[in-house]
Amino acid sequence: MDRRSIIKNAGIAGVLAAGIAPAVHAQATIRWRLASSFPKPLDTIYGAAEVFAKKVSEMTAGKFQISVHAAGELMPAFGVVDGVQQGSVEMAHTVPYYYFGKNEAFAIGAAIPFGMNSRQMSAWMYEGNGRKLMNEFYAKYNLVSFPGGNTGTQMGGWFRKEIKTVDRKSVV
């Protein structure tokens, strides 16, 4: 084999190798906006969305960027689901029971007073078809849900009147 043949074959191999290079290098960066129902100072909850966005960026070598926006920056805190439904933002970080007024079933997608504890909720979501059932429900609202954390059993209760004394008869 002469030198010209080697150079020609190496050139062909180089062109072929370039042609089969991963398409990921040619893809444009995807940029999504995440509207949160939570303010920045609530770092235990709001911060979870920031950590999520950072991890997605790291796992995609920066090709999928999520900008996280606190409550009120892009829309009202309790309007983030409407924002996703209308296409104003691509993602929301919220708690389903905030949307109880749309449908009472929104309440069971998160901790509720006297409801499941964190282990029970995780077991139901991942082993008891809870995620599947919730997404069947959310599909009616043009939504897809991914559990994004678990704060445990609801801290406190939901009452019609402000509690000012230890007298529980007035709230029962």
Where are these regions (language model features)?
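Immediate post-signal peptide segment of exported/extracytoplasmic ligand-binding proteins
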Residues: I20-S37, S57-Q65, A139, E162-S170
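N-terminal secretory signal peptides and thylakoid transit peptides that target proteins
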Residues: M1-G14
